[in-house]
């Protein structure tokens, strides 16, 4: 047992080299290693890039890839028309022409913040994706709108009821949204619907000149291209005119 354990204890060879010198020599011997690793990585990258080049060359030689490259179109050709009308699509133009009549857009689309429809969701997204107020469509065959929600001022107390003259004084001045299918805004102050401040049953809509499809499309494009700040300023100016009437 002693003979077997002796080599573990007794050192056959000793040295006078200090630990500092020993580790310095070890460090010098290990210094070339990072260079070797770097060189080997470069070789691997070169091999991989060569493989990629060969693969790319093979792909270019394939008939299907060549046919696809020949059909490559420019950016404008792939995108097609870039005007507002092409991006909005026809359903929106049809809604604006058939339902609202073109001139009632500023108030209808922008949500009636004062004295307009309250409750449910805002009508701000009317023309950009449609609107459903508590399960009721905006227009049904051209009839007047009568949603089941309160108005901020006046309630549903339009002259002649919601089916004949609109939704009361609070909706859009003394006009309402009705008018027996003759347009969304039959009466109301000038500019936004009809002419003047008539108290009939949507007669203001009949006084409008007949607009062609191109004119309506141009009006819609011009309106949709306006910024939000510009539309807010228009609505504030209009509501400032209608507020004295709603307080009567």
From Swiss-Prot:
GO MF annotation: an example: RNA binding
Keywords: Acetylation, Isopeptide bond, Methylation, Nucleus, Phosphoprotein, RNA-binding, Transcription, Transcription regulation, Ubl conjugation
Classification lineage: Eukaryota, Metazoa, Chordata, Craniata, Vertebrata
Annotated positions of the Phosphothreonine modification: 242
Highest taxon above the source species: Eukaryota
Its job: Plays an important role in the ligand-dependent activation of estrogen receptor target genes. May play a role in the silencing of fetal globin genes. Recruits the 5FMC complex to ZNF148, leading to desumoylation of ZNF148 and subsequent transactivation of ZNF148 target genes. Required for the tumorigenicity of glioblastoma cells. Binds to 5-hydroxymethylcytosine (5hmC) and associates with the methylosome complex containing PRMT1, PRMT5, MEP50 and ERH. The CHTOP-methylosome complex associated with 5hmC methylates H4R3 and transactivates genes involved in glioblastomagenesis.
GO cellular component, one term: nucleolus
Modified residues (Phosphoserine): 40, 49, 64
Gene: CHTOP
PANTHER family named in the record: CHROMATIN TARGET OF PRMT1 PROTEIN
Protein name stated in the entry: Chromatin target of PRMT1 protein
Record PTM: Asymmetrically methylated by PRMT1. Symmetrically methylated by PRMT5.
Assembly behavior: Interacts with PRMT1 and PRMT5. Interacts with the 5FMC complex; the interaction is methylation-dependent. Interacts with FYTTD1, SET and PRC1 complex members CBX4, RNF2 and PHC2; the interactions are methylation-independent. Interacts with ZNF148. Interacts with WDR77 and ER.
PTM sites of type N-acetylalanine: 2
ATP-binding is among the record's keywords: no
Region of interest: Disordered: 151-204
GO biological process: chromatin remodeling
Placement of sequence motif GAR motif: 194-203
């Amino acid at each position: 047992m002693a003979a077997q354990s002796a080599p573990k204890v007794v050192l056959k060879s000793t040295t006078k080299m200090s630990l500092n010198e020993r580790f310095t020599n070890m460090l010098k011997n290990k210094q070339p290693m990072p260079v070797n690793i770097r060189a080997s990585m470069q070789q691997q990258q070169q091999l991989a890039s060569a493989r990629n080049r060969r693969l790319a060359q093979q792909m270019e030689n394939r008939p299907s890839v060549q046919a696809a490259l020949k059909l490559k179109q420019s950016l404008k050709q792939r995108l097609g028309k870039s005007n507002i009308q092409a991006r909005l699509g026809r359903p929106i133009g049809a809604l604006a022409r058939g339902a609202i009549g073109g001139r009632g857009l500023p108030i209808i689309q922008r949500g009636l913040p004062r004295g307009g429809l309250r409750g449910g969701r805002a009508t701000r997204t009317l023309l950009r994706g449609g609107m459903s107020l508590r399960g009721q469509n905006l227009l049904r065959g051209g009839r007047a709108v009568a949603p089941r929600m309160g108005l901020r001022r006046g309630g549903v107390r339009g002259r002649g009821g919601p089916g004949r003259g609109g939704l009361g004084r609070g909706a859009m001045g003394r006009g309402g949204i009705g008018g027996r299918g003759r347009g969304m805004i039959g009466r109301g102050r000038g500019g936004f619907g009809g002419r003047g401040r008539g108290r009939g049953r949507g007669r203001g809509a009949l006084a409008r000149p007949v607009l062609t499809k191109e004119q309506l499309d141009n009006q819609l494009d011009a309106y949709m291209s306006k910024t939000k700040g510009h539309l807010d300023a228009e609505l504030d100016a209009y509501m400032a005119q209608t507020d004295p009437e709603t307080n009567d």
